[in-house]
Amino acid sequence: MNLDVSDLIKKVELSKEVHLKLEDDKRFFNGEEEILYLEAPTLDGVVSISEDILTLNGKLSAEIELSCSRCLQKFKYHVDTEVHESFTNNPQCEDDEIMLLEDEVIDVTEVIENNIIIELPIKRLCKENCKGLCQQCGANLNFSKCKCEKDIDPRLAKLKDFFSTQ
């Protein structure tokens, strides 16, 4: 989805309110996994211009589906974050934080995806006390107990007897 900012670049306007809902895309790939939008992401904010720098400030809200790091179960995750992005159409700008505009439009899809990726938790858990999967049979320990016997290191078997007698 593209946002036309030609009026701002031509200084016809100095700021513009933005209310966008990303309806086109249902999913995106973040380099590790495919992320599914359960609800279309919304971006509400203001685009303003100062000299040759466009600034987008707003609030991003999205409902996405993630996979739990322990049990691989899909779960719903809500993203609410502030968006602060800067753009320019000046190719001589050397600031790494400022993105270069093409054809006087802002690629809002890229802005939304990048901000969602930044907000993703490092350890994605369906619930705080997720028990994960059994390492032997693969059963989801959140829903059932497996019947696997625990392997005991023979070198430490004597310690088990030692602590049970005291």
Task: Annotate each PLM feature.
Residues 1-166:
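Structured interface patches
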